[in-house]
Curated annotation (Swiss-Prot):
Protein name per UniProt: Acyl-coenzyme A amino acid N-acyltransferase 1
InterPro entries: AB_hydrolase_fold, Acyl-CoA_thioEstase_long-chain, BAAT_C, Thio_Ohase/aa_AcTrfase, Thio_Ohase/BAAT_N
Enzyme class: transferase
Keywords: Acyltransferase, Fatty acid metabolism, Lipid metabolism, Peroxisome, Phosphoprotein, Transferase
Residues the record lists as Phosphoserine modifications: S125, S414
Organism: Mus musculus (Mouse)
Biological role stated in the UniProt entry: Acyltransferase which efficiently conjugates very long-chain and long-chain fatty acids to taurine. Shows no conjugation activity in the presence of glycine.
Length: 416
């Protein structure tokens, strides 16, 4: 019988699960399945797991437990979320979402194949294309007034619920989450706010009027549903997203993923208001055994007076926190914000805390990025996360994020 490696679907969105099966092998055979992908800079990411075939000579990743490798146990998508960079401290992140997918090569070997120095030919291979954009989604480059970014629109006439997508100190324009959400029926503006085109090269301050201009632009678009928009935000972006929720009436639903609930590093300005950043206790910074810097404890001693005025938020706020976040004690920050809401008699906040999850909680099946190189620091920064717990958090939170936006952005009678 011919040995086969079957992966279905072989062409799908990155948040869709893939079924992987090996057939035509001898019974009780130890096999290796490897996954390999290159990013747009030719950095290689790889994972592997060792399995034992059943009496029919088959391995089904939905049923067969991995005996060893990058994970152990039954994890149908383990080869995807356990991908690791061959060169340390690289992060797998799609830049050109419209024109190409990540192409993941799956290879099957009929032995334990783990030595890089020994080349063994694979018995079967399969390619899987993982897209960040679905059929019919359109991308519009945005350069309106001061606003710089990319707007992703789902197929159809609309109007669609509108969302602004913000990332952190990575800067530039990050589009992969916006394009993926647009593939699920949301109109999403991936918004740059520094280190992009004619925007400031460095983040010297957060000018909230820039983000208000972006919110007004989005609401003025003919395909955007009224009366308000959502914000999805991560890290420094989540700090800005929370400030938008507090001060901008246009924002009615905000998702803050592992962000500070204070102003950090640089001041925040809005009209006549200036919010100075809290001081970080840099002497509490720790260095991980890998050499990556952990900032988790540098903002632990924040005072309640430093918390952004969440009670002023006119919309709903969803805090998503990883309890193993090594960049920020994000659970403490979110708890302080929730406490402030309660003291003001507000029930507009909700917190989802994930034990074992790290800082970079991304769409399902994204590889855990425990640490990555930060040019600004000249060394790697630690994000934390336990592989299995982090993967579970990404799956669950992605569903909850979409449910949250559907509930609070859609008018009664609308369908999505």
């Amino acid at each position: 019988m011919m040995i086969k490696l079957i992966a279905t679907p072989s062409n799908a969105l990155v948040d869709e699960p893939v079924s992987i099966r090996a057939t035509g092998l001898p019974p009780s055979q130890i096999v290796t399945i490897k996954a390999t992908v290159k990013d747009e800079n030719d950095n290689v990411f790889q994972s592997q797991a060792f399995y034992k075939t059943n009496e029919a000579g088959e391995v089904d990743l939905e049923k067969t437990p991995a005996l060893g490798g990058d994970y152990v146990g039954v994890h149908p998508m383990g080869l995807f979320f356990s991908l690791k960079p061959k060169k340390a401290f690289h992060r797998l992140m799609k830049k050109d979402v419209m024109n190409s997918p990540f192409c993941i090569c799956l290879d099957l070997y009929d032995s334990v194949n783990w030595l890089e120095t020994v080349r063994i030919p694979s018995k079967a291979s399969q390619r899987v294309q993982r897209w960040f954009v679905g059929p019919g989604v359109k991308r519009e480059q945005i350069q309106e007034g001061r606003v710089r970014g990319a707007l992703f629109l789902p197929p159809g006439k609309g109007p669609f619920p509108g969302i602004i997508d913000l990332f952190g100190v990575i800067g530039g324009l990050v589009e992969f989450r916006a394009s993926l959400l647009a593939s699920h029926g949301f109109a999403v503006l991936a918004l740059a706010y520094f280190a992009y085109k004619d925007l400031p090269e460095k983040l010297q301050e957060v000018d909230l009027e820039y983000f208000e201009e972006a919110a007004n632009f989005l609401l003025s678009h003919p395909k955007i549903q009224q009366p308000g928009i959502g914000v999805i935000s991560t890290s420094k972006g989540a700090e800005i997203g929370l400030a938008m929720a507090c001060y901008l009436k246009q924002v009615i639903a905000t998702v803050c993923i592992n962000g500070a609930t204070t102003t950090t590093a640089v001041p925040l300005r809005y009209q006549d208001l200036v919010v100075t950043p809290i001081q970080q206790a840099l002497e509490r910074m720790e260095v991980h055994v890998s050499g990556a810097v952990c900032f988790r404890h540098t903002t632990q001693y924040l005072q309640n007076k430093n918390i952004l005025p969440v009670e002023k938020a006119q919309g709903k706020i969803l805090f998503i926190v990883g309890e193993n976040d090594e960049l920020l004690d994000s659970k403490l920050h979110a708890q302080r914000a929730m406490d402030r809401l309660r003291r003001h008699g507000r029930s507009s906040g909700r917190m989802l805390a994930y034990p074992g999850a790290g800082h970079l909680i991304e769409p399902p099946y994204s590889p855990l990025c425990f640490a990555s190189w930060q040019p600004v620091l000249g060394r790697p920064m630690c994000f934390g996360g336990d592989l299995m717990a982090h993967a579970a958090a990404q799956e669950h939170s992605w569903r909850e994020i979409q449910k949250f936006f559907r509930k609070h952005l859609l008018q009664s009678g609308s369908k999505l």
